[in-house]
Amino acid sequence: MKLKTILAAALLAVGLSVNAQTIIKFSHVVAADTPKGKASVFFAQKAAELTKGKVKVEVYANSALYKDKEEMEALQIGSVQMLAPSLAKFGPLGVKEFEAFDLPFIFDDTADLHKVTQGPVGASLMAKLEPRGIKGLAYWDNGFKSFSANTPLKAVADYK
């Protein structure tokens, strides 16, 4: 059900013509065999299936079209219609609150993360993108950050 809602929102965002096929360019910067890469291909397949071919999602993995720092501008000018960026990429657009997701120790686990992203806070953050010409469709899990050091990292102060 959630996938159908996301797909419907994507179709509205790009404007579906009655007879013409709509092409959605979906750019991301990770390899095709990663969870995000596989999910983007799955999305493309479901879009074609659920729209009976009226929507074709072209997936461009591994920075094939744009590098990480170029993707957001490409989205804003319409060169691509979908991205799956790191949430921190929305900070330079003036929505600095998204940068909080990159802080260590902010969530205890994935369930804790989902309480925020799938609740009122997540919806409020998504709404802040719309005045910038971006319609957020969903939060994708991208795994927690991993750090390594020569000494144990147990508190924020240990990262200095």
Question: Predicted segments — roles?
Answer:
Residues 1-2:
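N-terminal secretory signal peptides that target proteins for export/translocation
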Residues 5-14:
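Sec-dependent N-terminal signal peptides
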Residues 17, 54, 79:
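Conserved functional loop/turn residues at catalytic and ligand-binding sites
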Residues 25-42, 62-67:
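Extracytoplasmic "Venus flytrap"
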Residues 33-58, 120:
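Short, polar/charged alpha-helical segment
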Residues 44-45, 76, 81, 86-160:
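Contiguous mixed-secondary-structure segments that line small-molecule binding/active-site clefts
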